[in-house]
Amino acid sequence: MSREIRSVVTGTVYQIEVTVGEQVKLGTDLIILESMKMEIPIVAETDGTVIEVRFNECDSVIEGQVLLMVDPD
């Protein structure tokens, strides 16, 4: 079952570190958000494969929005 990776803050997508199909390990930076001039890394909560990225760099997000989906190994 796919795992939703959600935004922990309201802000802007500063940098996307992964692509669809990429294998990630626990703790890997997936997306960097910017909020109040701070960069907040969103990291993988498990080993797996990125199956969907829902935002582009510079997009605005709100706290709790699904940023991407990871299919756990």
Where are these regions (language model features)?
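Generic C-terminal helix-cap and adjacent flexible tail
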Residues: 25, 72-73
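Short histidine-centered loop motifs in beta-beta connectors
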Residues: 15-19, 23, 52-55
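Short beta-strand-turn/beta-hairpin segments enriched in glycine/proline and small hydrophobics
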Residues: 1-12, 32-45, 72
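A structural signal for short beta-strand/turn segments enriched in small hydrophobics and glycine
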Residues: 21-30, 58-67
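Short low-complexity stretches enriched in small and charged residues
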Residues: 1, 8, 18-26
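Short alpha-helical linear motifs
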Residues: 51-52, 68-71
